[in-house]
């Protein structure tokens, strides 16, 4: 086989989900040649692979989309409060095709290495087809929830049934009348359990850390609601982009204990009956995630709801969390009610841990063999940096990104890395916490401003513009993120993916900026568009 010739390209993007599509859209009019690759067979990223039953967004439909194309916002169809996986994938395909972005994409193609060449001031990128690309700008858009977390369960290969991770659900898997076990009760576990329970012969939920889940209150939207959204999108996006978490509703500035107890209860009931997980956290009160005493009152309210809904006291006990209400909240449409079904049971893995997989099921340490036809692993992701550190990315002086991040990922503004010139990350480690799409848009804007500056330098001086965060800026941004997290109870739960604690051996640390989307945008736009603060000067 003859070797492939090295190909020149201005911008090389890895990933074709929300991040890669959004970045390609933002760069489309700059006159740059763009190459986008993705290891998957089509665009869509997380929303291409997470096809498990019940998969849907926890963000309301009117703001789970790009803000940039107003005509598209007002005309593209959606008819429910929340989008299902097929609808999100269809939207991404539509957006890419409308803006002619597919022409730059190549699928079933993995990046094998990306190495900075100091002499030519370019990235040498090798891909699985055998080709090598040389790019002036290298952009990773691999997603923060894309590398599956596969648990180490003894003898799993001996199971004669079907094993399926929710992030890679087999297309032909039909669980009807099957004996199904589900390991994990995060968002995907809650959704798949609720969806499949009515159709399976039996469902056993293996739960170690039960989480708080709230009603999504999903429903069909009315024509009047869609008209309201269309007529107010300018105001909606302005408010959203200056908000704390960017979910499209006004966030409260009311402290929890400023309200008398009876009124507090009324407001919590209103949130339970009309809100969703994120609304519950921030719409009526401003300090549920920062005031531990307020959080405990909320926890008691939620625990009481579980006992009210789940009729079997033993099942209810196993479903009641003992931790703070301090994870990204899960929204559901009948999760707790599902446990009132006779065909649904629970194994508390703290009381009876998994010992091994057998040929016909799963054996727990109390000696019980739970016979199964299908084992579903709803065990989440090696989140945030998981995909970035599994490939060979080498910056200045032979510095490998994996080695640079051995004690946890670092960045400037979640988009730039000191020592890795002209490398950018769309919504990378220490990016904004909240609605993923506006967080992606903010990061894309920072990157685009930086590339525009570099191109202006190149046009003026005839030299390659080098965008590189300083070590001081990266260190300072890390402290900013640490300080913001100190105020947030999310940081107290060390076994969550926000801290890296869901992966054995992974360095613990803050992986997001909790200071607010509005603050994040203001800091990033000032640095990349106005002051160039935090970057090495151009030469």
Regions found by a protein language model. Give the residues of each.
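Active-site glycine-rich loop that binds ribose-phosphate moieties when present
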Residues: 166-168
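Rossmann-like NAD(P)H-binding beta-loop-alpha module
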Residues: 178-200
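N-terminal FAD-binding dinucleotide-binding subdomain shared by FAD-dependent oxidases/monooxygenases
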Residues: 2-11, 16-156, 172, 185, ...
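Short, surface-exposed connector motifs at secondary-structure boundaries
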Residues: 177-178, 317
């Amino acid at each position: 086989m003859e070797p492939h010739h090295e190909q020149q390209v201005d911008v090389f993007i890895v990933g074709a989900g929300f991040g890669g599509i959004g970045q390609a859209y933002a760069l489309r009019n700059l006159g740059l040649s763009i190459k986008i690759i993705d290891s998957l067979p089509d665009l869509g990223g997380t929303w291409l692979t997470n096809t498990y039953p019940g998969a849907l967004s926890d963000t309301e439909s009117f703001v789970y989309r790009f803000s940039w194309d107003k005509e598209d916002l007002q005309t593209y169809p959606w008819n429910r409060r929340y989008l299902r996986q097929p609808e999100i994938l269809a939207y991404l395909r539509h957006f890419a095709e409308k803006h002619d972005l597919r022409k730059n994409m190549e699928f079933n193609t993995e990046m094998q290495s990306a190495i900075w060449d100091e002499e030519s001031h370019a990235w040498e990128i090798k891909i699985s087809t055998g080709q090598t690309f040389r790019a002036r700008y290298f952009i990773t858009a691999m997603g923060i929830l894309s590398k599956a977390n596969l648990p180490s369960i003894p003898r799993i290969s001996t199971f004669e049934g079907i094993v399926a991770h929710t992030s890679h659900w087999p297309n032909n898997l039909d669980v009807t009348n099957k004996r199904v076990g589900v390991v994990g009760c995060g968002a995907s576990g809650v959704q798949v359990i609720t969806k499949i329970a009515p159709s399976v012969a039996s469902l056993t939920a293996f739960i170690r850390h039960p989480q708080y889940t709230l009603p999504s209150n999903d429903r069909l939207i009315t024509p009047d609601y869609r008209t309201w959204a269309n007529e107010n999108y300018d105001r909606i996006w302005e408010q959203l982009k200056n908000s704390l978490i960017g979910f499209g509703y006004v966030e409260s500035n009311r402290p929890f204990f400023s309200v008398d107890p009876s009124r507090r209860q009324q407001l919590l009931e209103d949130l339970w009956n009309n809100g969703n997980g994120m609304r519950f956290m921030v719409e009526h009160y401003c300090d549920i995630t920062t005031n531990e005493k307020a959080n405990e009152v909320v926890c008691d309210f939620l625990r009481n709801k579980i006992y009210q809904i789940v009729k079997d006291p033993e099942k209810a006990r196993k479903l009641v969390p003992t931790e703070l209400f301090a994870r990204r909240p899960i929204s559901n449409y009948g999760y707790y009610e599902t446990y009132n079904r006779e065909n649904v049971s629970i194994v508390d893995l703290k009381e009876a841990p998994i010992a091994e997989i057998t040929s016909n099921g799963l054996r727990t340490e109390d000696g019980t063999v739970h016979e199964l036809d299908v084992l579903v692993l709803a065990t989440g992701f090696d989140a945030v940096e998981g995909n970035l550190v599994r490939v060979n990315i080498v910056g200045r002086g032979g510095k490998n990104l994996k080695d640079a991040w051995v004690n946890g990922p670092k960045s400037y503004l979640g988009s730039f890395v000191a020592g890795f010139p002209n490398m950018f990350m769309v919504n990378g480690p220490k990016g904004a916490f909240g609605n993923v799409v506006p967080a992606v848009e903010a990061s894309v804007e920072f990157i685009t401003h930086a590339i525009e500056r570099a191109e202006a330098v190149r046009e003026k001086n005839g030299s390659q513009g080098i965008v590189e965060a300083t070590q001081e800026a990266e260190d300072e941004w890390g402290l900013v993120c640490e300080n913001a997290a100190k105020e947030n109870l999310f940081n107290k739960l060390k076994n969550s993916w926000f801290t890296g604690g869901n992966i054995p051996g992974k360095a613990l640390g803050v992986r997001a900026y909790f200071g607010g989307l509005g603050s994040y945008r203001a800091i990033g736009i000032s640095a990349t568009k106005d002051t160039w603060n935090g970057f090495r000067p151009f030469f």
